[in-house]
């Protein structure tokens, strides 16, 4: 929310981009945040202690500081490009291991956390859109910077290298988070190895969207075989009417089913 509203809308003062940034910011604070807050309410975690706990967790606190440091600069075209490129990867890769972990409870015959799965689908669809929009901003600005001669070939190479290095840092961060998920042992139906390779695939997608080549190319990625199915497919809302998207389903219609 803060990045779209306070960075993108100020750095890109075009009305159409500002409308996009405002819409994305609203989705984060007006749709996703209430959903996750509702989960916390059901779990009894909607309290100040829980919402500030990340500050006392060295791993999570360092990640938040790293993100803030990497995307805050706006003094040059180069730094704006780097910021938007990194943020596009953050939107398209960070949290996806958590998305996959939660979604697996509703796959492969488990059929648990139905409401949570629906909300995660909304988040994954929106985060993917936000990532792709950020990548479009990056490519457009880079093309214009090249045409206007405000970025050199050497800077273009450096930019690519910095963004590729960032994917490796993101993977390291995600690996630590994934390790926390399995601190108390293995979980039937999903593994840390599967989640790591899924994050690698997400980072490759982000690089491709930015106009760069893949660097991870995981050959073992079973999560992808089921993760995207209910994100991309239509569902039958009414046998006698038509098909539509589950995105229109309201998770507040009923109680959470575990």
Regions of interest found by a model, annotated:
Residues 1-258:
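Non-heme di-metal
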